[in-house]
Amino acid sequence: KKQVVLTVERDGTTADITVSLEKVEVTVVKSRMLDDSLGYIQITEFTDGTSEQFKKAYSELNEQGMKGLLVDLRENPGGLLTAVCDTLEQILPKGMIVYTEDKSGHRTEHTCKGKTPIDIPLVVLVNENSASAAEIFSGAVKDHGVGTLVGTTTFGKGIVQQTFSLGDGSAVKLTTSRYYTPNGVNIQGTGITPDVESDWPENAEEFTNPNQ
């Protein structure tokens, strides 16, 4: 393990403290069973650890007899494109997840192998602060028809931005491309309209009822 030495000054004296550096993984996925058959997974952000955390939560809920799943993306600001694609790989059928296109028309596709498509009712909760990667997740679920979106229209961030370092130590962030849902929809400035609009979707459980 790498170590750093911190020098601390207190009451006119100094002391060196050796600290070991470790990777800290923030919990961005929380899950629980809402009742005997309905599972709930909240994703707060799409980071390097999201896919594995989702996989673990999804597996544990299945072991507990889950027959319907509620994925909560409300207040999720987005995150890494790779993270949302790896997460969707676990539930989508074979096909497009999302594609990006730059100003020259160069297109980059991100697809799903479809080895483990979800086979239970799925509801995705969204609101006006669900953005970027959260909208990629929502758009893919909606376009593939594997789940129902419930909530309010999402933020509407359908662009890809990159940060470029400058010689003086500063940096500039530029829009380099736009992303599109599997059906070719760019949601920049418009967002994704849910299938069921509700400010506080307290009744979302009914949309995952396997008996309906």
Predicted regions: what they are:
Residues 1-157, 161-164:
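Cleft-lining beta-strand/loop regions that shape enzyme active-site pockets
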Residues 15, 187-188:
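Generic structural signal for well-ordered beta-strand positions
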Residues 41, 172-174, 187:
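Short hydrophobic-aromatic micro-motifs
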Residues 166-177:
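Short acidic, Pro/Gly- and aromatic-enriched capping/linker segments at domain boundaries
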Residues 181:
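Short, acidic, Ser/Thr-enriched surface-loop or helix-capping motifs
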Residues 189-212:
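Conserved helicase C-terminal RecA-like lobe
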